């Protein structure tokens, strides 16, 4: 939702308000919990609209999310906080289509999609022993409380998979494309805790799209919040325990400051060490009269080379994403942010022509999004995201991805937990 008009609204709030910097999911979740206890707050958002990474544009009847984003319905905190029915969630098929040696192979969860059992068994992704190891891994990660995964020993995912006996073939042809598609990490160097948690979530729920785009998630979180407590186009220049100073020079006082921004911005404002590197992506959208695939699968590049990381047809998943008679195609490229838009589009078309034939040249380019900080790197050891640290400084709190795990689940949970900590610290003064 575009809230640009809010920047002109009255800021005369009680002096004891909590100042939340950032109107992404973590900031909104924090505000909702504070509101339950009637704690005054104000949200300051640098962008002209809320949602953090979850933004959506509508162009000529096509719904374009800013980058490849999905909602995993098995996320515990998302199930608790969000109304899935109102979001109109539409699921991808449980599995993926992986391109290997110039051919497409359908890999599906045989328990949830039994009609694709034979194609899954026939796919040249590894040995029968590898398939049994996958089944064993799925059983192991689904035991007990999902949060207990973050108490396990941590190591790079590549090392973890090798320790479980997986062959080089299945690592290269299945796990690398899978992890590249989910975590933008084709070398699978990220935390094995993160990998195991993601693997569990994929096996327990659907990968889905809200019918009106990913921005609908933030819009739903915002609906219960007082509109005059959210101020967009308000970049914070500096913070201190008693308030913040905006880029405009305006000072806003409060009883506490909660940083709910992306990792690099949190580090800047808090004056702490910058987090590790970022995973960037380029997301290109095309319109076509005929889709390149007929089923609602994510298409992954398992060739070990090429520019394209993944391809989806959102309009097959949720018909609302494209006007009648058209389909929406989304293509993700990892990194390559130094290549200009025209060159990226030309190279992507050339590569996809090898995949799908000359009809790719008839696709109409709609828009290209460049996301420099699509995800932070997630090396081991990853901290337990269910445990929030106390205030970084007296009166200053941090929620969201900084020092934790990125993703919808953890943004919602960290926002709620940080609000709980603020409430606890404010209790003696109420």
Q: Which residue stretches match the model-derived regions?
A:
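N-terminal Rossmann-like FAD-binding beta1-loop-alpha1 element of flavoenzymes
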Residues: 16-43
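Active-site/ligand-binding neighborhood in enzyme catalytic cores
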Residues: 126, 133-238, 242-243, 254
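Glycine-rich FAD pyrophosphate-binding loop
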Residues: 35-59
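Dinucleotide-binding Rossmann-like beta1-alpha1 core, especially the glycine-rich loop
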Residues: 60-148, 155-157
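Conserved flavin/dinucleotide-binding core of flavoenzymes
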Residues: 6, 320-430
């Amino acid at each position: 939702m575009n809230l640009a008009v809010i920047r002109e609204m009255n800021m005369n709030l009680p002096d004891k308000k909590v100042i939340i910097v950032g109107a992404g999911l973590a900031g909104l979740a924090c505000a909702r919990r504070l509101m339950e206890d009637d704690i005054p707050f104000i949200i300051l958002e640098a962008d002209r609209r809320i949602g953090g990474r979850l933004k959506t544009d509508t162009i000529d009847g096509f719904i374009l999310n800013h980058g490849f984003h999905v909602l995993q319905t098995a996320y515990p905190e998302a199930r608790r906080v969000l109304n899935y029915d109102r979001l109109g969630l539409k699921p991808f098929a449980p599995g993926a289509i992986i391109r290997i040696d110039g051919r497409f192979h359908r890999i599906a969860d045989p328990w949830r999609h039994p009609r694709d059992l034979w194609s899954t068994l026939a796919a040249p992704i590894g040995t029968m022993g590898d398939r049994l190891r996958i089944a064993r891994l799925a059983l192991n990660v689904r035991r007990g409380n999902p949060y207990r995964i973050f108490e396990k020993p941590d190591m790079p995912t590549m090392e973890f998979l090798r320790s479980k006996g997986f062959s080089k073939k299945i690592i290269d042809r299945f796990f690398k494309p899978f992890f590249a598609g989910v975590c933008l990490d084709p070398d699978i160097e990220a935390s094995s805790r993160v990998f195991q948690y993601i693997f569990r979530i994929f096996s327990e729920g659907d990968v889905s799209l809200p019918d009106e785009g990913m921005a609908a998630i933030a819009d739903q979180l915002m609906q219960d919040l007082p509109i005059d407590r959210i101020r967009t186009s308000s970049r914070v220049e500096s913070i201190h325990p008693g308030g913040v100073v905006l880029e405009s020079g305006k000072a806003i006082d409060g009883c506490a400051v909660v940083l709910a921004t992306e990792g690099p911005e949190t580090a800047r404002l808090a004056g702490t060490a910058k987090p590790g590197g970022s995973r960037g992506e380029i997301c290109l959208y095309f319109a076509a009269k005929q889709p390149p695939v007929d089923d609602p699968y994510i298409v992954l590049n398992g060739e070990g080379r090429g520019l394209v990381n993944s391809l989806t047809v959102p309009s097959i998943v949720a018909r609302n994403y494209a006007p009648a008679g058209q389909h929406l195609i989304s293509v993700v490229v990892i990194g390559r942010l130094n290549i200009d838009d025209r060159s990226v589009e030309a190279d992507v078309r050339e590569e996809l022509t090898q995949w799908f034939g000359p009809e790719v040249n008839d696709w109409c380019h709609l828009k290209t999004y460049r996301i420099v900080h699509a995800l932070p790197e997630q090396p081991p050891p990853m901290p337990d995201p269910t445990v929030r640290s106390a205030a970084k400084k007296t009166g200053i709190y941090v929620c969201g991805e900084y020092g934790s795990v990125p993703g919808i689940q953890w943004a919602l949970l960290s926002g709620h937990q940080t609000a709980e900590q603020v409430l606890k610290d404010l209790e003696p003064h109420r």
